[in-house]
Amino acid sequence: MAYAAERYITVIPEIDLPGHMQAALAAYPELGCTGGPYEVWRMWGISDNVLCAGNDKTIQFIKDVLAEIIDIFPSEYIHVGGDECPKVKWETCPKCQARIKALGIKGDSKHSKEEYLQSYVIHEAEKFLTENGRSMIGWDEILEGGLAPNATVMSWRGEAGGIEAARQQHLSLIHISEP
């Protein structure tokens, strides 16, 4: 971090959640909807195995990981991912469905109740970061189901996510992957 700071470089860490957590689930299978076992993937991909949004231990795990990131990285911003999180396990998970019921979450014509459940997880992460003096960045999927109040949206699927974030009075970054 000192090397970067000496060169006026801000390192913004990214920890992807609640999806892209296959390795974490292999280490902590109780944080998944099925309890595992889970294998660490050796190749990139999108797994249906994601953090269980209905498990209180999951929310604490997220806060613990973010606390460690805060200790290591002085950046004002921390990227929480929020992309590519299949909801298929949440649809049948008793804990996730109980959380949906407890929060009074309802699906609508735009978003499923599970998409709103992901918004709950992202809001919890954003609230923790704000309480600790940091700002959250997330991929444009965090727009689905309601955006955390102080979030910055990094749109990787085109300009539509960035425009929608701006409409909602949020900072937005548009990632251009093609020349």
Language-model features, listed with the residues they occupy:
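Residue-level detector of conserved catalytic or cofactor/ligand-binding positions
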Residues: I174-P179
